[in-house]
Amino acid sequence: MANNEFGPEPDGNGPVSVMVTLGRLGAARQLAAATARRMGMRPSLIPDTIIAINEITTNAVTHGRAPARLRIWRDNGDLVVEVRDRGHWTNPATVVAGDLSADLPLKPVPGGRGLWIARTIARTLTADTTADTAMSTANASTRVTLRFALT
């Protein structure tokens, strides 16, 4: 399996790639669901998968600099979802750290639960960010990658 700038090439089913803005989140959810079906995801897994994808994509377009790029492909029996934006997290390791057996974070503010939800649904969630912080975050990039079982 060959690699490219986005990671492993899909095995058999070509990747789907779309730019997402706040106004296009609904269309992105529909595309993700159709892609998951086309790539062989068990139908009962699709609703939760779309919830996780929506949470990460919504974060990208509301906290990063829109538009965000949503990419979906198949790799070794998993559905792989990558969301990239032009934002910068100071410490992306905090996104994937933590005890998933802990209760849902109870904050007295709206929001703040999307990453926790996505981490509990996905098989894996990784996040990384790049920026020349010595100069500015103008060239920053954040990538969140989720893997979901197809069956």
What is the meaning of each model-derived region?
Residues Q30-N54, K107:
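Conserved short strand/loop->alpha-helix "switch" segment adjacent to the catalytic nucleotide/phosphoryl-transfer site
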Residues P15-Q30:
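STAS-typified acidic loop motif
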Residues A52, T57-T62:
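Short, well-structured hydrophobic secondary-structure segments
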Residues A27, D48, I117:
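Charged catalytic carboxylate motif
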Residues M1-P15, V61-T151:
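Conserved beta-strand-loop-beta-strand hairpin that lines the nucleotide-binding pocket
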